[in-house]
Amino acid sequence: MRGWLWLLVVLALGGLFWWGMQRNPKELPSVLAKERRPAPDFTLPLLPPYRAEWGEAFRLADHLGKRPIVLNFWASWCYPACYEEAPILEASWRRHREEVLFVGVNTQDKEEEALRFIAQFGLTFPQVYDPRGRVGVDYGMYGVPETFFIDREGRVLAR
């Protein structure tokens, strides 16, 4: 009897794993976006290259009401996806910086590795540091990279 129970548990877990792997991560729902909920506020330290222009810390609430925000979660160990999208985000920032604020959130990473990544791609939009990934949890992030689009009023429009 005990053997059958163990086999049943293994089969059930295997089935759940298989089902999860069939899902398209781009189609995973975001409750924040679906219900246009307010973006969770946060204050995080800016990485050193951005402090002269943006200050020591970045607080989301200080930037609401001015322009939409593109909030991108990334990590240096996120390969190849983060490496592929970094130049696209930088080009978009350079093209639309007057209309849209881009903010990078380096998450669950080592600061030295994050700085190396930033230098490699010449990222000029502000980058904050969240080594424990707490802000990503507040946003319901599934993994990196993940980008949230926040309107002027501070509501999450899309993920």
Where are the regions that the model predicts?
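N-terminal targeting signals for export/organelle localization
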Residues: 1-49
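Thiol/disulfide oxidoreductase modules built on the thioredoxin-like
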Residues: 65, 116-124, 129-159
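Short pre-active-site segment immediately N-terminal to redox-active cysteine/selenocysteine motifs
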Residues: 67-69, 74-78, 143
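Active-site loop/turn elements of alpha/beta-hydrolase fold enzymes
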Residues: 75, 107, 130
